[in-house]
Amino acid sequence: MSDKQINLVIVTGMSGAGKTVAIQSFEDLGYFTVDNMPPALVPKFLELLERTNETQKVALVVDMRSRRFFKEINSILDHIELNANLKLRILFLDATDSELVSRYKETRRSHPLAADGRVLDGIRRERELLVPLKSMSQHVVNTTDLTPRQLRKVISDQFSSESDQASFRIEVMSFGFKYGLPLDADLVFDVRFLPNPYYQVALREQTGLDQAVFDYVMTHQESEAFYNHLLGLIVPILPAYQKEGKSVLTIAIGCTGGQHRSVAFAHRLAQDLTADWPLHESHRDINRRKETVNRS
């Protein structure tokens, strides 16, 4: 059995208060997540996790969809408290009755405790039953006035640590406009205005990762000026993206074919950012022209 501590978060609370958004937020923070786990299965699940040697951060949604919820949850929590390898925190999500009714009307779903179809009656019944669990919770969040993004931010602030900062990472990529914009790009920059190495016969078959092409692109005055502006724009906004709870920021730099100018710029940007941020560099279309030639 592993002697590593498992950081366990049980996400619970009122139906409709935002547990789906919450569990997605924990996944973005690097937690192993399970939605709608029956309380009776929790001890066995945790035993299996303890046998592994991996770092454990686990978030489980346990709520009213589990039919025997109230009969089992107290004994399960007692079992967890007795395990020295488990650090338990309970996140309880709440909202006003009127807000929950509004959300149910919007989604046209039925409340799990509304046997007669009256949502408000189900909400009141659930709220009454959850009073003991709410009193045991270390974190109670009222989501009445929170957007999904704001809820993600609250969870990130309360449950991330310095070691979790790696959960925010940067993707720097190059691409060719002729092959289409990257669908997942957050920031797109166009460097097609720069001198094109393609028209230099000696450089045509090389890429922006080759020193000769890199030097050709970067030694032009307009290239250096634009790059300095680009870096000056990006560096100050990265902490703001992280603060907002974004898990991946994709910065895409494009030229015509994605082989020369954009590759050189993306590579330089990645080199300058990687010392301070978790980063992955990729070049979507760097071999696209060669593949096209080979097929023809």
UniProtKB/Swiss-Prot annotation:
SUPFAM superfamilies: P-loop containing nucleoside triphosphate hydrolases
Species: Streptococcus equi subsp. zooepidemicus (strain MGCS10565)
GO molecular-function term, one example from the UniProt record: ATP binding
Keywords: ATP-binding, GTP-binding, Nucleotide-binding
This protein's record includes keyword Nucleotide-binding: yes
Known function: Displays ATPase and GTPase activities.
Family, similarity comment: Belongs to the RapZ-like family.
Lineage start: Bacteria, Bacillati, Bacillota, Bacilli, Lactobacillales
Binding site for ATP: G13, M14, S15, G16, A17, G18, K19, T20
Positions with a binding annotation for GTP: D63, M64, R65, S66
Top-level taxon of the source organism: Bacteria
Coiled-coil stretches noted in the UniProt entry, renumbered to this chain: none
Record protein name field: Nucleotide-binding protein Sez_0730
Alphabetized Pfam families for the sequence: PapZ_C (PF22740), RapZ-like_N (PF03668)
Gene3D superfamilies per UniProt: P-loop containing nucleotide triphosphate hydrolases (3.40.50.300)
Key word GTP-binding present: yes
Listed transmembrane segments: none
InterPro entries: P-loop_NTPase, RapZ-like, RapZ-like_N, RapZ_C
